[in-house]
């Protein structure tokens, strides 16, 4: 069925992503994502917004300070062509965002600027460093991951493509 195919494709893609990046690569990416979230949490709170979550990895939700509306945040975000999450929980006072592996210093400062503008404040430029992680130890794994050789060999585009072609050649299906 289409649903099974869609799930299998996502699982296959995730497996190849893990194989391509390996344990060290995934840890580096995770550090990058979380560090960006930590910087955003710290800087946006300095503007008077209240962080609504105690533990986070990449997703933040902020309660808006008195006098700041979702519409003001939305308008400032749209000026920068950035989409944020606006909680429709009835209170109209929560805005969220998520970071990913592509976020950079410019985008971090743009996001901080959006929240500053909505609050009628200015924000200083912040430097983005990948070493700002503050993960709760209870959120961390204590076992080794991705120890099989496939996760430690194919870290170049050429190597990964050769590996994928090799898998394709070994495929035994009803189509051949």
Question: What residue spans do the PLM features occupy?
Answer:
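Flexible, glycine/charged-enriched surface loops at secondary-structure junctions
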Residues: 25-30, 44-55, 87-89, 122-129, ...
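Active-site C-terminal subdomain of aminotransferase-like
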Residues: 1-57
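Short acidic (Asp/Glu) and glycine-rich catalytic loops that position anionic groups and cofactors
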Residues: 10-22, 51-56, 88-95, 136-145, ...
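Conserved phosphate/anionic-ligand binding catalytic regions in large, soluble enzymes, centered on
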Residues: 4-13, 102-103, 171-176
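Flexible inter-domain linker/hinge segments
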Residues: 105-176
